[in-house]
Design a protein with these regions (language model features):
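SAM-dependent methyltransferase catalytic region
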Residues: 1-129
Length: 129
């Protein structure tokens, strides 16, 4: 579905397919940094966070360890303030299911083309093709 600013929102099945093909699966993600440079309302982020939490829980991580992992390994950028806020709301709602609160998300409300602070620091750069 296409919106203003040329935004294209990704269906969940395609999100999962892209994450699977990229290798962002199971035990290979807890020490990896990932960024979604145009996160929209959070389609990729929601699945990324879910996979991260599920992987951490399978390794018996504490809630505090998971929270720190989310804050230090998952990044995103969204230019549209409406979708930036919506993505954060959806992520916090997802966290409620896991009884995790107070995550300080590394999500910027900026133009990804003008952000260079993450260059060369990420293991995965994921987004709508």
């Amino acid at each position: 579905m296409k919106k203003n600013l040329g935004q294209v929102f990704t269906d969940k099945w395609l999100v999962n397919l892209i994450l699977d093909f990229s290798g962002y699966t199971d035990n290979h993600i807890l020490d990896k940094k990932i960024i979604e440079p145009s996160c929209g309302d959070g389609a990729f982020l929601l699945e990324i966070v879910k996979r991260y939490i599920d992987s951490a829980l399978s390794k018996n991580w504490s809630i505090q360890q998971i929270k720190e992992g989310l804050e230090n390994h998952i990044y995103a950028i969204e230019i549209d303030k409406k979708y930036y806020k919506e993505a954060i709301l959806k992520l916090n709602k997802l966290l409620e299911k896991y009884q995790i609160t107070g995550v300080k998300w590394n999500i910027l409300n900026e133009d990804a083309l003008k952000i260079h602070q993450y260059n060369g620091q990420m293991d995965f750069v994921i987004g709508n093709p």
